[in-house]
Amino acid sequence: MAVGKNKRISKGRKGGKKKIVDPFAKKDWYDIKAPSSFTHRNVGKTLVSRTQGTKIASEGLKHRVFEVSLADLNKDEDQAYRKIRLRAEDVQGRNVLTQFWGMDFTTDKLRSLVKKWQTLIESHVDVKTTDNYTLRLFCIAFTKRRANQVKRTCYAQSSQIRQIRSKMREIMIKEEASSCDLKELVAKFIPESIGKDIEKATQGIYPLQNVFIRKVKILKAPKFDLRKLMEVHGDYTAEDVGVKVDRPADEVVEEPTEIIGA
């Protein structure tokens, strides 16, 4: 058999080069909107395939989770150590309306807090808000030296740690989380009011510093309610409502006259 190119085989090959299709041609961009409790509402954009047959674009967007820095949401660089998770709940036009879905600390902030010569105290508790959200709050605190203390170390005893943990749970459940809804609770996380209350309450047991709600996980959410979501977002309405136009009383609308024989 002669060695060489078989021309008949190459002629029988169907088609030429494969057509290059842009993957973004069949996709649409949607704006992500944060709840009204944050200063900056436009979080960013997200991509989804267009509606094709039974595959609806808005259904593909729902329940997506976005992680955003609190510094971007509130335009404050001092809050850059917090990461906020937002979950897409509904789509209104080209806007994706989100709801708070958790919070966490950045790794560098958490590591900067842990130091020698002090005791780290952690506690976590499950709470239920008035609007039926079940959350798990993780609290972290560190002991500090008393006023006029000469000794370098400030280690707390086991009995004191147990008392502080008990106080943490009490404040997180009774005084804070269980008496408010999710929107009000998020408003307490940002200025760290829960941490300040814990620090004040445990002053008699052992002085604390750097008391934070370091992490929030949502364990269970209630059934989706569009009206409640609209309350969280504030400037959106559940349906498009037309604007009423005032017409002067003396203005008469002329009716077109019928021309006979035209």
Curated annotation (Swiss-Prot):
Keywords attached to this entry: Cytoplasm, Ribonucleoprotein, Ribosomal protein
Localization per Swiss-Prot or TrEMBL: Cytoplasm
GO cellular component: cytosol; cytosolic small ribosomal subunit
Principal cellular location given in the protein's record: cytoplasm
Protein name: Small ribosomal subunit protein eS1
Membership in a protein family: Belongs to the eukaryotic ribosomal protein eS1 family.
Superkingdom: Eukaryota
The species this protein was found in: Brassica campestris
GO molecular function: structural constituent of ribosome
Keyword match Ribosomal protein: yes
S-S bridge residues: none
Subunit structure: Component of the small ribosomal subunit. Mature ribosomes consist of a small (40S) and a large (60S) subunit. The 40S subunit contains about 33 different proteins and 1 molecule of RNA (18S). The 60S subunit contains about 49 different proteins and 3 molecules of RNA (25S, 5.8S and 5S).
One Pfam short name: Ribosomal_S3Ae
Chain's gene name: RPS3A
GO term, biological process aspect, one: translation
